[in-house]
Amino acid sequence: ASDVYKRQPDMSMSINTNTFLNTLMSKIFIASRAKIKVPAKVSPAAVPVAALGGNKPFGLNAYNTVIAIGASTGGTEATLQVLKDLPADTPGIVVTQHMPEGFTKMYADRLNRLCHMKVKEAQSGDLIERGQVLIAPGDFQMKVVRVGNRYSVNCYSGEKVSGHRPSVDVLFQSVADAAGASSVGIIMTGMGRDGADGLLSMKKKGAFTIGQDAESCVVYGMPMVAYNIGAVVTQVSCSNISNVLLKHLYSL
């Protein structure tokens, strides 16, 4: 699997993004079929105590927070790096990763094996709950909607937005509308600008926003645009995103 993310594409070249992503996902599929021993579940001892905030409980305001993550090229492993360091009772997370139909279920299952939180491919009507991560299904848009004092997701076959379905902009804009200041947006490695405008909407509504830095990105595209338009509150390395997120949640 070592060749999957080895080379960073030249963004100055004319690239058929869909072809590139499909090739990437095919490699991920091949890698996932390799006979590599993987623990059924990560042991809590494997996560640094500092990353877990000393196992102290989150406050009520934290549990009312919606965490949204958006990523593209290189994002499958980057998102794993963030999620695996979060404790099992972390507030609900929604993720849009650019992936073709048929791959997101497999990806969610892999994350579920490797993370403390429960991870599943999202279905319309799924509630955003403590300890659970919902992955946008391939070839579907995913929005967050408010249902009373709770949040759920709506997955639908709409038009492509920012050239993508699922689109990070669709997710982030819906979180801005539904949760406003009670949300966190994280934009990670990826080509293009999908998610930048949606993250700016979140920030304008009072959300805390995090961008992955250039050094740790496979492609510093989406986070770069978000940073340049003022959508990012703090920009950090992929390995530090979980710590920054937890520090924010414990402060609520």
Regions found by a protein language model. Give the residues of each.
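Short, small-residue-biased leader/transition segments that mark boundaries at the very start
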Residues: 1-5
